């Protein structure tokens, strides 16, 4: 049985790349926090954002672009924006 080809989308790939850079930047800022308690608090709050980013990336790598792709990215974006509004970083 032949494997179904993934549907690719260059604009979506750009959004994933931009999201990756945002996650890396925030993680770097969190790791730069000297106070261990505050760093732990920020990290635990940001873990959900990282999880949602990983879900978007993994889904795209495995299945390509499909009907649910934009929804997954929207969930990530909402979580990222919520984190930014609740935590000053």
Please give the residue ranges for each predicted region.
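Short acidic DE-rich linear segments
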Residues: 1-6, 82-89
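N-terminal acidic leader/helix
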Residues: 3-40
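Generic detector of leucine side chains in alpha-helical contexts
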Residues: 8, 25-27, 52, 72-73, ...
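Intrinsic disorder/low-complexity segments in short proteins, especially the signal peptide
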Residues: 13, 77-78, 87
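Extended rod-forming repeat segments used as scaffolds/tethers
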Residues: 20, 29-31, 44, 48-49, ...
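Long, hydrophobic, amphipathic alpha-helical segments used as structural scaffolds
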Residues: 27, 31-34, 57-64, 84-87
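Acidic, low-complexity, intrinsically disordered interaction modules
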Residues: 36-77
């Amino acid at each position: 049985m032949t494997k179904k080809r993934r549907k690719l989308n260059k604009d979506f790939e750009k959004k994933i790349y931009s999201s990756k850079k945002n996650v890396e930047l925030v993680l770097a800022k969190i790791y730069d926090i000297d106070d261990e308690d505050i760093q732990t608090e920020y990290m635990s709050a940001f873990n959900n954002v990282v999880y949602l980013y990983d879900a978007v990336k993994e889904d795209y790598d495995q299945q390509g672009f499909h009907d649910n792709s934009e929804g997954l990215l929207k969930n990530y974006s909402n979580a990222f924006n919520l984190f930014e509004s609740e935590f000053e970083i």
